[in-house]
Amino acid sequence: MASLAVQDDAMAALGGVSPLIRSGRIGDALSRLAAIEAGAGGDARLLQHLGEHYTHCGKPDAAARCYRRAVELTPDDPRCLYNLSAALIALGRIGEAEALLDRVIALDPQDADAWQNRSTLRRQTPGSNHVADLLKAVERVRPGPAEVALCYALAKELEDLGDPHHSFAWLRRGADRRRSLLSYRVETDVAAMAEIARVFGARLFDRPSAGCPEPGPVFVMGLPRSGTTLVDRIISSHSDVESLGEINDFALALMRLAGATGGKGDLIRRSADLDPAALGRAYLDSVAGYGRTRPMFIDKTPANFLYVGLIVRALPNARIIHLRRHPLDSCYALYKTLFRMGCPYSYDLGDLAAYMLAHRRLMDHWRSVAPGRVLDVEYEALVADQEAVSRRIIDHCGLDWQDACLTFHENTAPAATASAAQVRQPIHARSVGLWRRYADQLEPLAAALRAGGVDPAELV
């Protein structure tokens, strides 16, 4: 009974970690997790939960350690195997992860997430793919999330095999089903971005703003799937830089200082009146908990484009890099990605067009009111002339050039994004112009972008 009591105490202690993570107190959370892990012993359930919490703290190495111990204790538990595979993907151990997912599917053929994750790990080939098995699996599945995952897996593998017609048909089915499961109105996000631009007008930037004077971080931002992970890896291959990945610390610091609000509009209006120095300090105090070991760090949270007006006032020494990509390639890359959370606008072409147009308007606004603060990087230019554009990026960060920035694919740091497998490869142009394979299917999207003011020359 004593051991059961100890286990109950450990689970209770673990319950106190989640609020720390949600509030951005990562350092405190990691300290508690380490103490709980030290006493975890042979409790596979506790080790599983520890791994999940480490993952939420952006520590896939620690998560993998816990999941591996859990797998040793319960080697035929599909959940343990799946979670270990996810941690190994973030660590770049793609072959091991694929083998684990093979085991998951053998043990539990109904695990649609395992099918979908496995499809993304490499380019499928005529001699090595899972299309036939996926077609059988999708015939058996009920409408819902599992159907969505299998449809996305089929779309990915058929695209790899050079069958764009059937690939897009499965993608549309999966996206339509996912959209039907969401309660989301893109108009809310569009209105919020317009309100941000209104509140953070030119007059606000005329006010004196000391901000937090410490050397600032590098913010890499843009729409997801626009090349943010690639640029993050290029910069973090420098010996003076490490990446914290996609964290929410700036938004969390903002919400803590703003206090309880009456919704997005109220938060936006309150944020303009915050003390910039206090906001900058709150953010830097929060990220200190990640235990950095290098002088400079990267915050690669794509949605930070919403906060550029706050960032430049709160952190006057911050470096901001914004990724841009051909509008149709950008939207197609979003549309074909099954996000575990976030990006609810990405499952409908009309929503995608509306969100992209609002994003472009807001970025145009930031360039107008804070000229020179944002370095725009064109994904296509980076792919076409890697060294020249990489040097411009490193220079913008105030760093001396290092050749390691050209071999970013050898960077062993974790990458826990949808591009985790791709950034382990040298730069390539396979995805440039990929939208052209689907020009007919994407024409409604292109028409909406043209109607929204995008120069038709950008859409060819």
Residue ranges of predicted features:
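PAPS-dependent sulfotransferases, especially Golgi type II membrane carbohydrate sulfotransferases
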Residues: 100, 116-119, 131-143, 151-217, ...
